[in-house]
């Protein structure tokens, strides 16, 4: 015995991961991950257990036939290289490197194509400057053709590619499945459509669409790498890669990896997993590096520099007395950002409310983008009105001139003289710098708000960024005009740098529109200087404080316009929201099905709601929540019960009963009683009559000591059957030893019935055996039979809340876990449901919506007397009562809750 015990101990040593005791903590000599992989490989290949002897060599059967072919060494070599790379480098590193490389190539190629398109427009305009009419036609026709092609190509190939893409990614990362948003055709439509849209010269952006493009690239790359196996076969892993891809999209767009990571976190996530932090930084940094290296390779740059490099003085970038001016820029940008979001949303709402115009434009889908492009191109025509708003400059050229550190209005020094091209753009003959900047800001403001509504792939970050830079430049030029000799400090004179004000304004307005602070970091990486870090941070924070109190962010506004599932943030300064509880906002008339219900009850529950999930309770009296069941499962159950196969089975059984000879009927009941006996047997076994035969519930047979003793236990039989059915739903199949002698005759009888079911006629003959009245009567009989949920996929632990949960905690739970609904229970009893719809209305202040029984927010306060132990004990006993009230039904129709759980 001792020897066997020692042998057993030695045999179990590998099972214990070869643990050895050390000085302090002890350690395992075998990694847990390696051990798990070896065990998984052994189980998959069916090899012997390592502690039961040395494993015998085994050759996979698929390699036996081609073991001596030429492809075998190549396959073996590729597998070994893949394993070496995965083991030495890691799958995450390989994926992130490929993602960064692909996105850098796409970004550089797109910028190259956009630059070619813009140069072609300038070449056409300058080549026809002798004829003003032809020059106007060329200036207007070129962007109209590109925008029309972009809109048509996107609508035909993938309408999901329209717009920014950040609102959709924010919804997807929250757990909502949006079809066709991460497919290959959407990727192609987004890339080509965005290139044409930006090449037209319209005030559109690139950053938002590139977040969507990077996410699609990550999704497609995950599917490709899953062909070789590995962790990317798991779909839940893709969410982490999408979070990193959002950072890559911003990083390769502006060559700003740090700001890209922070910006992607702010605009797409409410709660961010820190484990994805390094993935975003690594991939975004690699992508930005390749993006700038390609610019050097194409000889666009001499070395790797910032995208909009500035040359502000570093010894004294700004004076302390200039901080109030920077604060004014931040506050004004906050109001401007809120106004931009409001104007963008109002344009869409006005177009939707005009039914006649909307129907006409829906039939002529390309007319609206063509008209908008024609209007904007006409206003920006350089010889016309465009000369007063620098219409001949592209967005990149505009930013370069606005970030210039030289003063435009002060012409006292030689080094402050502007180049001729810039002087002609911002100093037209019949206007000055201030008038040009004011017209530029006003015109670009509403043009950008209108252009972002065009159904093409486009963003709004870059136009807003340019408008903010122009506003900051206007303030800077005004300060330079008011203090022409600069601000005197301790006998030293430091002239004002208007370019620094432009940097502050760009970051402030972009942060106000997007509700982000990371725009400050993006500005530092774009300019390559951090000299104005304090003014930029002050302006961005003030702009966010003002904008967040007035309007949602641009992306949240688009989410509301598109009616995507979302959960708004709890606004600051609204203390009454923290006093609302779940019982004040929950829907009390919850659609549910009982464990002992009939198929008629299932049909009624399906007619009452269109929700995706239905609550499963023990009974209508107890309302004990057992789980949740999908609507598709209920539809399948009901369809199988009333299917044509069951009707044919019923006809077969009736014909067999009629055609049986009298000699075979000796000692057997009549056909009518035989059919009635089969139906009663199925009811007592709680098994739906389907085409196939199900095993009876074995625990139900073991509970009673004898069949004769069940006659006087009617009251306790229902309670026992509920527990038996509950165990059969959430437990696996019973062990073989649970089979008793009492179930053998029934199983034998079922086997006999199965053997005699022989088809005697074809389907057409069987269908003609029953009249419509008989079919209707048969369906009514089937609807009265009890339901067996044994074959349904039931969630035994749906998410639950208690009625005293606060709104703040509920919002945190919904945001953190990504759930779309939660059942409200009190000591296990279902009393209500809370979905995103109710939670959203409670946060936005419209909690008195139709169909939702809502108590006032202050009604949730309890006096000190009601919090005593006696009162709570009384409430607990009242909840356990068999006839306690579960809440009043809603005043609205049952269809009011149709959109819950969506």
From Swiss-Prot:
CDD domains: CBS_pair_voltage-gated_CLC_euk_bac, ClC_1_like. InterPro entries: CBS_dom_sf, Cl-channel-2, Cl-channel_core, Cl_channel_volt-gated, ClC. It is a multi-pass membrane protein. Residues 166-173, 241-253, 257-265, 499-513, 514-515, 516-527, 528-532 dip into the membrane without crossing it. A motif (Selectivity filter part_2) lies at residues 205-209. It catalyses: chloride(in) = chloride(out); thiocyanate(in) = thiocyanate(out); bromide(in) = bromide(out); nitrate(in) = nitrate(out). Signal peptide: none annotated. Residues 586-644, 794-854 form the CBS domain. A motif (Selectivity filter part_1) lies at residues 163-167. Residues 648-748, 860-902 are annotated as: Disordered. Belongs to the chloride channel (TC 2.A.49) family. ClC-2/CLCN2 subfamily. This is Chloride channel protein 2. It comes from Cavia porcellus.
């Amino acid at each position: 015995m001792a020897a066997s015990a020692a042998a057993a101990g030695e045999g179990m040593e590998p099972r214990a991961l070869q643990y050895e005791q050390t000085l302090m903590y002890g350690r395992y000599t075998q990694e847990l991950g390696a051990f798990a992989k070896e065990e998984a490989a052994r189980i998959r290949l069916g090899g012997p257990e390592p502690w039961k002897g040395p494993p015998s060599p085994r050759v996979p059967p698929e390699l036996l036939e081609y073991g001596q072919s030429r492809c075998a060494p190549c396959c073996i070599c590729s597998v070994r290289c893949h394993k070496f790379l995965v083991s030495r480098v890691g799958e995450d590193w390989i994926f992130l490197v490929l993602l960064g490389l692909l996105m850098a190539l796409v970004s550089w190629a797109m910028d190259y194509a956009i630059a070619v398109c813009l140069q072609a427009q300038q070449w056409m305009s300058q080549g026809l400057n002798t004829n003003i009419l032809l020059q106007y036609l060329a200036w207007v026709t070129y962007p109209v053709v590109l925008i029309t092609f972009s809109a048509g190509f996107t609508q035909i190939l993938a309408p999901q590619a329209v717009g920014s893409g950040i609102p959709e990614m924010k919804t997807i990362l929250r757990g909502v499945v949006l079809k066709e948003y991460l497919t290959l055709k959407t990727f192609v439509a987004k890339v080509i459509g965005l290139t044409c849209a930006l090449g037209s010269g319209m005030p559109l952006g690139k950053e938002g669409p590139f977040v969507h493009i990077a996410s699609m690239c990550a999704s497609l790359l995950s599917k490709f790498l899953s062909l070789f196996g590995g962790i990317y076969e798991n779909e839940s892993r893709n969410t982490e890669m999408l979070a990193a891809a959002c950072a890559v999209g911003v990083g390769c767009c502006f060559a700003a990896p740090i700001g890209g990571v922070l910006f992607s976190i702010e605009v797409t996530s409410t709660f961010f997993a820190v484990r994805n932090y390094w993935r975003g930084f690594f991939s975004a940094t690699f992508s930005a590096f390749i993006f700038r290296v390609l610019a050097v390779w194409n000889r666009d740059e001499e070395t790797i520099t910032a995208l909009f490099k500035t040359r502000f003085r570093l010894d004294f970038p700004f004076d302390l007395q200039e901080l109030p001016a920077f604060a004014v820029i931040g506050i004004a940008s906050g109001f401007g950002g809120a106004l931009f979001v409001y104007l963008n949303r109002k344009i869409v709402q006005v177009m939707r409310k005009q039914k006649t115009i909307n129907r006409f434009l829906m039939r002529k889908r390309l007319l609206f983008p063509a008209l908008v492009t024609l209007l904007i191109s006409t206003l920006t025509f350089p010889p016309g009105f465009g000369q007063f708003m620098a219409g001949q400059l592209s967005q990149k050229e505009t930013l370069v001139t606005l970030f210039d550190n030289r003063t435009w209005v002060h012409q006292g020094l030689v080094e402050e003289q502007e180049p001729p091209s810039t002087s002609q753009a911002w100093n037209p003959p019949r206007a000055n710098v201030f008038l040009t900047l004011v017209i530029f800001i006003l015109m670009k403001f509403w043009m950008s708000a209108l252009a972002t509504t065009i159904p093409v792939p486009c963003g709004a970050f870059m136009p807003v960024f340019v408008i903010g830079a122009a506003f900051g430049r206007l303030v800077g030029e005004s300060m330079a005009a008011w203090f022409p000799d600069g601000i005197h400090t301790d006998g030293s004179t430091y002239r004002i740098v208007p370019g620094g004000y432009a940097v502050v304004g760009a970051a402030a307005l972009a942060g106000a529109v997007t509700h982000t602070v990371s725009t400050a970091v993006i500005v530092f990486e774009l300019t390559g200087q951090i000299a104005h870090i304090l003014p930029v941070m002050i302006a961005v924070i003030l702009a966010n404080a003002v904008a967040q109190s007035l309007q949602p962010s641009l992306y949240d506004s688009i989410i509301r316009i598109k009616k995507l599932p979302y959960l708004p943030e709890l606004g600051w300064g609204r203390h009454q929201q923290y006093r609302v509880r779940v019982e004040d906002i929950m829907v009390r008339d919850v659609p549910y099905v009982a464990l002992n219900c009939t198929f008629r009850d299932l049909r009624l529950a399906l007619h009452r709601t269109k929700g995706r999930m239905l609550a499963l309770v023990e009974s209508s009296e107890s309302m004990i929540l057992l789980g949740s069941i999908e609507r598709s499962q209920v539809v399948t159950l009901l369809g199988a019960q009333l299917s044509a196969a069951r009707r044919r089975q019923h006809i077969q059984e009736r014909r067999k009963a009629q055609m049986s000879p009298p000699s075979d009927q000796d000692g057997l009941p009549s056909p009518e009683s035989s059919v009635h006996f089969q139906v009663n047997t199925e009811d007592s076994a709680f098994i739906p009559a389907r085409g196939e035969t199900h095993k009876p519930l074995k625990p139900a047979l073991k509970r009673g000591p004898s069949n004769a003793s069940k006659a006087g236990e009617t009251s306790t039989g229902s309670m026992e059957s509920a527990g038996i059915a509950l165990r059969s739903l959430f437990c696996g199949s019973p062990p073989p030893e649970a089979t008793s002698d009492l179930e053998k005759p029934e199983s034998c009888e079922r086997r006999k019935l199965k053997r005699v079911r022989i088809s005697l006629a074809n389907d057409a003959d069987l269908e003609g055996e029953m009249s419509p009245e008989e079919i209707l009567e048969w369906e009514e009989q089937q609807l009265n039979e009890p339901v067996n949920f044994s074959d349904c996929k039931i969630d035994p632990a749906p998410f639950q809340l208690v009625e005293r949960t606060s709104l703040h905690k509920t919002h945190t739970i919904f945001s953190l876990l990504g759930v779309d609904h939660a059942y409200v229970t009190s000591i296990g009893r279902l009393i209500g449901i809370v979905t995103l719809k109710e939670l959203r209305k409670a946060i936005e202040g419209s909690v008195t919506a139709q169909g939702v029984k809502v108590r006032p927010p202050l009604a949730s306060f309890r006096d000190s007397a009601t919090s005593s132990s006696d009162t709570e004990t009384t409430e607990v006993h009242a909840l356990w009562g068999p006839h306690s009230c579960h809440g009043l039904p809603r005043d609205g129709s049952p269809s009011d809750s149709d959109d819950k759980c969506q």
